[in-house]
Amino acid sequence: MATLIVLLYGLLAFGTVWLVRRQSKNHDAHRVMRNIPGPPSRSWMKGNIMQYFTRHGRAFQRDVALNYGPVVRLQGPLGRKILYVSDPKALHTIIIKEENVFEEPESTLITFNLLFGDCLVGSLGENHRRQRKLLNPVFSVNHMRHMLPMFYNVIFKLREVVMAKVRGGEKEIDVLEWTGRAALELIGQGGLGYSFDPLVSDKEARNEYGDALKAMLPALMNIESLRQILPHLVKMGPKWFRRLATDIFPNAHVQTVKHVVDTMSKRSQEIFREKKAALKSGDEAVLRQVGEGKDIMSILLRANTAASDADKLPESQMVAQMSLLVFAATDTTSNTLAHILQLLAEHSNVQSKLREELLQSGAGTGNTSYDELMKLPLLDAVCRETLRVHPPATLLVRVPRKDSILPLSEPVIGLDGTIIKDVPVPEGTEIVIGVFGSNVNKSLWGEDALEWKPERWLSPLPRAVNDASIPGVYSNLMTFLGGKRACIGFKFSEMEMKVVLAVMVSNFVFELEKEIEWNVAGVDYPTVVWDGDRPQLPLKVRVYKS
């Protein structure tokens, strides 16, 4: 009995010491976080984080990225501390070194799974590893080379429909509509072996899939507050009850998202069944399909059939990848392409020089190899510089699953004047990945870091950029992230941008007349007016005459 009492007292003492040490540790961590500079909060109740995540948050995002240093303290509801991190060493810890510790928030993972199903971006751990292992080969450079002729064939159709519109003279065209339709057709043929859009001028030929996708981003931003409580909502009753609640929920944006999800899911399942049946029927049936069996999903189906039981994906995950591929490849690339065309319209000298390079190389004719296209210096510079200054996705968050420490490349001066060399981060702290802040860091890129200057890529980059070891997978940029959760399709996106620009800039001149407002969302999108409802980017277009 005495031994048991001693043991109980010992356990009690150990627990007390552990609790005191943990509270002391958390107190120290929160003290450091309170000392980190950051923008003022309008309200303890609401904080200032929604100023960052709101549709019109670009000015606030720029203020956060430029005026408070490489680690910035933001405030969530009820005084919750949030960090914005653009320091290279800290980003390396989050993205590479301790990527298994710093994961997406539960609300983000649930959102992805509700939108697409059990897909790559909505999975963690072994499930994510297995999915990525199967997907990696189809996004290799070698596979991109095989798909290049198909890319040109699609964009030649885009060229013809625009040519028909402007052959009689200059005309205003919504380039976002056409880059979106082209992007959907490219991922349709190259990704799914399916034609979504014949790219003809009459709107009746358009696919409802594309219209649904364009409506999704604005709708998601309008229900951001609901998304934050998804971890609780998905636990309310059985699946049929949650579906019924969604069907009758009195909110237009929720109904828009529901319609998009239903459209994607239905079409993905139809295409999957067709492809599976064709593969079972043999090579001739596969060759009769749009992608002739060379598209991403046909290759994935064959690879999955041959995979070991441990690496094989269930059909539900294969269908989920299809919905994810279409969504991810459509808006990000098409919106970036529209932004590039806007910038070329604003910088006519760069547009003229790019056209000269493209005409001399013949890149707009399709008689260029993949390697030749990728190496065109000014074309490459225009793409890189746009992705640097205008990354399409900036709402990226990570959460540590345990207490962690972020080392810093350079010390931060605290509000009380003390030097902060590393930042202790308590478990569960939200960390906004400073994509824009890293991409325009003046200490790395120079005093002109905010300026769109493609010529900076035509000579060696500043030594500070190369020495910083920025953990991005693409060109010392954080635009496509890095590590095991980097954007798997960035090579697909890069090739698409270059083919579209090669063909369109070789044949047309683009000018800007209307003021364009870029809105914050999962993928930023343009409107003509500040509060415009419809994503669009109208430019004056005319045929180029040498």
From Swiss-Prot:
Glycosylation sites recorded in the entry for this protein: 367, 441
Enzyme Commission code(s) on record: 1.-.-.-
Gene behind this protein: CYP219
Residues annotated to bind heme: 487
Native source species: Postia placenta (strain ATCC 44394 / Madison 698-R) (Brown rot fungus)
Keyword Glycoprotein: yes
Signal peptide as annotated in the record: 1-22
Cofactor: heme
The entry's keywords: Glycoprotein, Heme, Iron, Metal-binding, Monooxygenase, Oxidoreductase, Signal
Presence of the UniProt keyword Heme in the record: yes
Molecular function per GO: heme binding; iron ion binding; monooxygenase activity; oxidoreductase activity, acting on paired donors, with incorporation or reduction of molecular oxygen
Pfam families: p450
Pathway(s) annotated for this protein in UniProt: Secondary metabolite biosynthesis
Top EC class for this record: oxidoreductase
Protein name per its UniProtKB record: Cytochrome P450 monooxygenase 219
Role: Cytochrome P450 monooxygenase that is able to use testosterone, anthracene, carbazole, pyrene, phenanthrene and trans-stilbene as substrates for oxidation. These multifunctional properties against a series of polycyclic aromatic hydrocarbons (PAHs) suggest that CYP219 would play important roles, at least in part, in fungal metabolic systems involved in xenobiotic detoxification.
Upper taxonomic lineage: Eukaryota, Fungi, Dikarya, Basidiomycota, Agaricomycotina
Family per record: Belongs to the cytochrome P450 family.
InterPro entries: Cyt_P450 (IPR001128), Cyt_P450_E_grp-I (IPR002401), Cyt_P450_sf (IPR036396), Cytochrome_P450_monoxygenase (IPR050121)
